[in-house]
Regions:
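Basic, helix-initiating cap at the start of DNA-binding domains
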Residues: 2-31
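Hydrophobic alpha-helical segments that form the core
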Residues: 161-180, 194-202
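Amphipathic alpha-helical packing segments from all-alpha helical-bundle domains
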Residues: 129-154, 164-176
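Acidic/His metal-coordination segments adjacent to aromatic residues that form catalytic metal sites
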Residues: 90, 152-158
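Helical hydrophobic small-molecule/effector-binding pocket
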Residues: 97-119, 134-147
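An amphipathic alpha-helix adjacent to DNA-recognition modules
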Residues: 18-26, 57-83, 87, 94, ...
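C-terminal peripheral helix-coil segments that are non-catalytic and often amphipathic
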Residues: 2-8, 183-228
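Helix-turn-helix
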Residues: 37-69
Length: 228
């Protein structure tokens, strides 16, 4: 008796993994650490990491844009962690700034090898500043929000503080702390934690018109650490 031939169903082709922004960033950071240099071309980088050039260009126009976005991601992740603390909304501005810096440098420490590579690899300050442009904008915006909150609580206009000066000061403070952290050889980077506390307290004390003792204390700390 004739029977119908069994047909073999066509094999399903494996669905290609969707490449995310996080995948590209992780692949780039791994690449520079494993090869101790930056990739020469998007084509070669993509091929080595099982993605297409289109996958890369979906998120970044070039490697410069990727490097900037890594710093933006550090900031975003820092704020996400801070806001997960239910008490954060009730913190004073001083406490919010301390929380920001402590969390940011904890994150940098988790990625210390990459951060040291990318900043030291670009020896010229302008190159460093180029990849930090987005971070600078975020930090200044964060500081501006804090000073706006403070000014809203002041009934006397003479007691209000300059948003521009304060936000720029916060960025200069960030650069100083990054350099301090890069050179810090203390266990657990405890000296960086001390620098964060003293610098933030000094900045807020200056803005609260009680600068002298705090500035002197911070100055002595810096002198001791740099001269040790």
């Amino acid at each position: 008796m004739a029977t119908a031939k069994k047909t073999t169903p066509p094999k399903k082709t494996a669905k290609k993994k969707e490449i995310t922004r996080h995948d590209v960033i992780t692949a780039y950071m791994d690449y520079v650490l494993e090869h101790e240099k930056t990739p020469k071309s998007v084509y070669k980088f993509a091929k080595d990491n099982n993605m297409s050039e289109a996958d890369f260009y979906n998120f970044f126009g070039n490697f410069d844009g990727l490097r900037k976005d890594i710093w933006n991601t550090f900031f975003t992740m820092t704020m996400d962690v801070a806001h997960k603390n239910e008490e954060y909304a009730h913190f004073s501005n001083r406490e919010k700034m301390l929380t920001f810096f402590y969390t940011f440098f904890e994150l940098l420490t988790l990625n210390r090898s990459y951060v040291l590579f990318t900043l030291k690899e670009n020896q010229h300050m302008m190159n460093k500043m180029e990849q930090l442009k987005g971070l600078r904008k975020h930090v200044k915006g964060f500081a501006k929000e804090l000073i706006q909150e403070r000014n809203e609580n002041k009934t006397n206009i003479l007691l209000e503080r300059s948003e521009t000066i304060y936000s720029e000061g916060a960025w200069v403070q960030m650069l100083f702390l990054m350099k301090f952290w890069m050179d810090d050889d203390s266990a657990g980077f405890e000296k960086t934690d001390m620098a964060i506390e003293k610098s933030v307290n000094t900045i807020f004390d200056v803005f609260d018109n009680i600068p002298l003792d705090a500035v002197l204390d911070f100055g002595k700390f810096l002198w001791k650490e740099r001269m040790a």
